[in-house]
């Protein structure tokens, strides 16, 4: 009661973390009775954080309040933009989860790296593990790391950067970022990667394409979202 009396007449500002990211639109690029795919902007969480409530999952639950199961099937880092898939009912979720587990969903990312890549394509196979002394960073570790494989190909080259198409075969945390930056990978960090390279306006990593079999119709679906950097 005393504190309430003291605060009377004072304007208490709302915690800015509660509305963090709400100025970033998240367009729906595909929807039906089973699935929703959105183009997540860079700077928006995939799921709610400890302090930040706004997220792709929160927005989907608000957009589809009658869905029997708005479930996120995979995640993107907060600084990564691009395609995220949600299921809207338990049956679709079970069938799509099976595809993700069996690695039947094909994902293609587009990234810009610092430097000019000499070869036109290749495969990076470096095991990854959390760097517990410097989280959330991940590190290459032959002893405790989990198998991680990335296929890459060059799209374009400029004087100082290279645009790549990246296809992760596995889905480890920061896999694409570490595989590009590590000396045993490409040895070239992504543009704007504050964890493994040099900080910039934004991370140049975008989830560009999803290819999968529809859980109900069994039709092969391909969805793309244009790069915005």
Feature map (PLM): residue ranges:
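RNA pseudouridine synthases
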Residues: 1-229
């Amino acid at each position: 009661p005393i504190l309430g009396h003291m605060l009377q007449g004072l304007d208490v500002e709302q915690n800015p973390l509660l509305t963090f990211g709400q100025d970033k639109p998240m367009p729906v690029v595909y929807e039906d009775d089973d699935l929703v795919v959105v183009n997540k902007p860079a700077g928006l969480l995939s799921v709610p954080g400890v302090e930040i409530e706004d997220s792709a999952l929160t927005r989907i639950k608000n957009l589809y309040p009658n869905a029997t199961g708005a479930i996120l099937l995979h995640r993107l880092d907060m600084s990564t933009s691009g395609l995220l898939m949600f299921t809207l009912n338990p049956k679709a979720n079970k069938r799509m989860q099976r595809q993700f587990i069996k690695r039947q969903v094909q994902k293609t990312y587009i990234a810009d790296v610092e430097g000019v890549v000499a070869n036109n394509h290749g495969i990076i196979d470096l095991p990854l593990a959390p760097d517990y002394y410097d989280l959330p960073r991940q590190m290459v570790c032959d002893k405790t790391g989990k198998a991680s494989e990335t296929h890459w190909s060059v799209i374009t080259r400029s004087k100082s950067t290279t645009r790549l198409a990246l296809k992760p075969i596995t889905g480890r945390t920061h896999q694409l970022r570490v595989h590009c930056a590590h000396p045993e990978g490409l040895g070239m960090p992504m543009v704007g990667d504050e964890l493994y390279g040099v900080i910039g306006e934004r991370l140049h990593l975008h989830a560009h394409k999803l290819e999968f079999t529809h859980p109900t119709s069994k039709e092969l679906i391909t969805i793309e979202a244009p790069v915005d950097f």
